[in-house]
From Swiss-Prot:
Species annotation: Marinomonas sp. (strain MWYL1)
Protein's recorded name: Gamma-glutamyl phosphate reductase
Keywords: Amino-acid biosynthesis, Cytoplasm, NADP, Oxidoreductase, Proline biosynthesis
Spans through the membrane: none
Gene Ontology terms: cellular component: cytoplasm
CDD domains: ALDH_F18-19_ProA-GPR
Organism classification: Bacteria, Pseudomonadati, Pseudomonadota, Gammaproteobacteria, Oceanospirillales
Amino acid sequence: MSLESYMNQIGQQARAASRLLAKASTKQKNMALFAMAEALENARPRLVEENAKDMENGRAKGLDSALLDRLLLDDKRIDGMIEGLKQVASLPDPIGEISDMVYLPSGIQRGQMRVPLGVIGIIYESRPNVTIDAASLCLKSGNATILRGGSEAFYSNQAIAEAVTAGVVAAGLPEHAVQVLNTTDREAVGKLISMPEFVDVIVPRGGKGLIERISKDARVPVIKHLDGNCHVYIDDEADLDKAFAIAMNAKTRRYGVCNAMESLLVHASVAGDILPKLVFALQEKGVSLVGCDQVRSVSGEIGAATEEDWYTEYLAPKLSIKIVANMDEAIAHINKYGSHHTDAIVSQNYTKARAFMTEVDSSSVMVNASTSFADGFEYGFGAEIGISTDKIHARGPVGLLGLTSQKYVVLGDGHTRDN
């Protein structure tokens, strides 16, 4: 079978499955999730065995230690996948909820019903556990899924797919509710993002290059998660003890995550009080620092920040620092250089905090809290499929609700409209 025929078949199967999933009961979907968890447990030896092939191939190709770590499937990570399925099963099912039902002057009632998007294509790299994250969220939200994992995780993903299908079928749901492409041909990605007749939305998870390419070439709407160039602004009316704790947590909790602080902005009037202490603590943690001329004059031996630094998501123990004259300058800097992901203000002034929340154009805006809280679990959504930096359709952490839409429903009793 040609690649085009294969992809068309996958698309047709997904579309047919989506019609059945849209009317599946919450009980049936939860049964499938628990059955998937049981199938993963039973397949544990096979998962480890197939992952070993991917790890061996990865080492042969010279993948670095960070990529190999993402690729690894050990007992702890398999336990995490199983627990993740059970957590998604415990989440409220949004499908079928009717809200904003009102009587109108004509006598009809109008409301909105929560419905699935339909068929979701998910393209991702390296981490095989994403296969379970994506499959579980899409299934619970009533969507059929076509998954295209990275070629480096091919054997792991195929083994996971077998367990997923076994669980879905055991619960009486359509066999093709979740499909993992069984080809490493890169042309499959191009086809997947060009099938609007079968696919309703694409969710890419991976590096900036992958996401930009898909966004540019797709003929299907894309929910994208681009850079996490996150800022913390320390205001002149900040509690400096809180500011110190927030800045340290936002930067050093984890370096390689999208909600880590990459740039620190400090009001000029408090820079001399907090920067020397912060710089020392960050350098003690091994963080490489670059800053503007004012920062360097206050804080001693740190590198000079370039224009490129202000735009950069380091995903590493590195931080850029800038002193600003006021909050307006901080907001202008964030809106120019930031990635619209997550930005924070530390201030005891309510009016300033409100203005910052209103004017900063990001998917999450924090007041007196670390950027590290930008996360589906921390927001009470349960699992997430990513953090969208778009404004349409979903924005911020994308959980079950972000994988749904709404349609209007109208109730009448023989009502007709006058001419």
